[in-house]
Amino acid sequence: MEHQSLFSFSNPEFWVLAALVIFFGLLVVLKVLPGALFGALDGYAAKIKAELDEAQQLREEAQALLADVKAQREDAERQAAAMLEAAKADAKRLAEEAKEKLEEQIKRRAEMAERKIAQAEAQAAADVKAAAVDLAAQAAETVLAARLAGAKGDTLVDAAIGQMGAKLQ
């Protein structure tokens, strides 16, 4: 087997190489290959840039949305904390009001009971005094009746009893 040089005119690979160089040379001279090749590359680059721009825009929108959601969550947490504090304050206020009302009601009932006790004591004292007056009047009547017997005694006893009853009441 004989080895032929690549640059030999009898070598078919030389002619394929030459045809290929001439073909690409014509394409470059006629500006077919660079325009088509660079146009395709430019179109692909523009498409990639548009996708990157869109991705960047979507990322910025997502970050803005995330920040908005975080702000809303923080606001909701603040509102919930404020509502909880208000509820605690209301519960404390209502408990204090209920305690005050209960104390006032107990005080009123105690005062009412004291008034009833005072009235009962006054009534009992009046009843005892009236009974003592009646008993003293009966005893005096009996004693005077025994000492003064006769017509003159009856008039004196009646006058004394009348005066005693008026003075005691």
From Swiss-Prot:
GO MF annotation list: proton-transporting ATP synthase activity, rotational mechanism; proton-transporting ATPase activity, rotational mechanism
State whether keyword Transmembrane helix applies. yes
Major localization listed first in the record, in broad terms = membrane
InterPro entries, A to Z:
ATP_synth_b/b'su_bac/chlpt, ATP_synthase_B_chain
Spell out the GO cellular component terms annotated for this protein, sorted alphabetically and separated by semicolons. Answer: plasma membrane; proton-transporting ATP synthase complex
List all membrane-crossing ranges: 14-34
Q: Where in the cell is it found?
A: Cell inner membrane
Keyword terms: ATP synthesis, Cell inner membrane, Cell membrane, CF(0), Hydrogen ion transport, Ion transport, Membrane, Transmembrane, Transmembrane helix, Transport
Q: Name one Pfam family in it.
A: ATP-synt_B
Task: Provide the topology term for how it sits in the membrane.
Answer: Single-pass membrane protein
Tell me the protein family, please. Belongs to the ATPase B chain family.
What's the stated role of this polypeptide?
F(1)F(0) ATP synthase produces ATP from ADP in the presence of a proton or sodium gradient. F-type ATPases consist of two structural domains, F(1) containing the extramembraneous catalytic core and F(0) containing the membrane proton channel, linked together by a central stalk and a peripheral stalk. During catalysis, ATP synthesis in the catalytic domain of F(1) is coupled via a rotary mechanism of the central stalk subunits to proton translocation. Component of the F(0) channel, it forms part of the peripheral stalk, linking F(1) to F(0).
Per UniProt, subunit arrangement is: F-type ATPases have 2 components, F(1) - the catalytic core - and F(0) - the membrane proton channel. F(1) has five subunits: alpha(3), beta(3), gamma(1), delta(1), epsilon(1). F(0) has three main subunits: a(1), b(2) and c(10-14). The alpha and beta chains form an alternating ring which encloses part of the gamma chain. F(1) is attached to F(0) by a central stalk formed by the gamma and epsilon chains, while a peripheral stalk is formed by the delta and b chains.
| Name of this chain's protein | ATP synthase subunit b
